[in-house]
């Protein structure tokens, strides 16, 4: 993919896996990804920030549990507080208006995408499970250490174990990117994107979905993308609306302080 053709990706929630049937009767395993009200929150520009990018927000967060600085950040964009914020670098002509909502038809069936997420944690794992080692022999002098990794180095020279040596250790819970996954189907009304095969992470986790860096498979893609602007959406969120939603939490926090001040005045 050329730098000047780079579109924004989206952040989606992994709902789980299913299967769909092809015309020849074969079944295709698919992962269901949900675009939960993905909106543009802010822009990064080359003049101000040194690079061009879009900041996207997805999901709903309670205003009373959102820090005041972030409430102002969302109110400036006229969007409700978001649970997840992600940034995607884009070409200058691929910037999308702040407040716009990206839709599922941003991706086209048949195109290739890259999906990044946090893999499922497996805890401490041995070398056979973690790296696929074959282990040691079952007999002929091997005792207890059948599943060990064996020698970790050479002789007195170099006399050390090199960094990055494949050994037992913590497995999973790291960022993983699966490349060149095919988009099978999209549902604009439900905000659903079906991709072929498995993607990193557990059900309910967040993943980043973007055009494949190694090519989109020759499919014509909409530029700068498919979205609904603020004018096409419902009434935009203003700063007053966000602050009013957060007012009960601020009042609860202020009540103990007021009570403490009253007790001090009575004692005086």
UniProtKB/Swiss-Prot annotation:
Keywords: Methylation, Ribonucleoprotein, Ribosomal protein, RNA-binding, rRNA-binding. Residues 242-259 have a biased composition (Low complexity). One of its GO terms (cellular component) is cytosolic large ribosomal subunit. GO terms for molecular function: rRNA binding; structural constituent of ribosome. The modification N5-methylglutamine is found at residue 156. Residues 242-268 are annotated as: Disordered. Gene3D superfamilies: 3.30.160.810, Translation factors (2.40.30.10). One of its GO terms (biological process) is translation. Methylated by PrmB. One of the primary rRNA binding proteins, it binds directly near the 3'-end of the 23S rRNA, where it nucleates assembly of the 50S subunit. Belongs to the universal ribosomal protein uL3 family. Part of the 50S ribosomal subunit. Forms a cluster with proteins L14 and L19. This is Large ribosomal subunit protein uL3. It comes from Maricaulis maris (strain MCS10). The gene is rplC.
């Amino acid at each position: 993919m050329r730098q000047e053709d780079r579109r924004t990706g989206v952040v989606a929630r992994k709902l789980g896996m299913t299967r769909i049937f092809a015309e020849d009767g074969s079944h295709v395993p698919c992962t269901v990804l949900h675009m939960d009200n993905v909106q543009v929150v802010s822009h990064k520009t080359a003049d101000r920030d040194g690079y061009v990018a879009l900041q996207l927000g997805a999901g709903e967060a309670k205003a009373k549990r959102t820090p005041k600085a972030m409430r102002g950040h969302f109110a400036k964009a006229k969007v409700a507080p978001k649970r997840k914020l992600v940034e995607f670098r884009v070409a200058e002509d691929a910037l999308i208006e702040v407040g716009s909502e990206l839709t599922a038809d941003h991706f086209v069936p048949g195109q290739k995408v890259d999906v990044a997420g946090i893999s499922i944690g497996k805890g401490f794992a041995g070398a056979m499970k973690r790296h696929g080692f074959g282990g040691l022999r079952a007999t002929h002098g091997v005792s207890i250490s059948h599943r060990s990794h064996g020698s970790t180095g050479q002789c007195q020279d170099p006399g050390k174990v090199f960094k990055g040596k494949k050994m037992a250790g913590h497995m999973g819970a790291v960022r993983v990117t699966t490349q060149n996954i095919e988009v099978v189907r999209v549902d604009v009304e439900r905000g659903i994107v079906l991709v072929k095969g498995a993607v990193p992470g557990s059900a309910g986790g967040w993943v980043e979905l973007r055009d494949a860096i190694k090519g989109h498979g020759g499919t014509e893609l909409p530029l700068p993308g498919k979205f609904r602007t603020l004018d096409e959406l419902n009434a935009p969120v203003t700063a007053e609306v966000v602050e009013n939603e957060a007012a009960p939490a601020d009042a609860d926090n202020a009540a103990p302080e007021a009570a403490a001040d009253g007790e001090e005045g009575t004692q005086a």
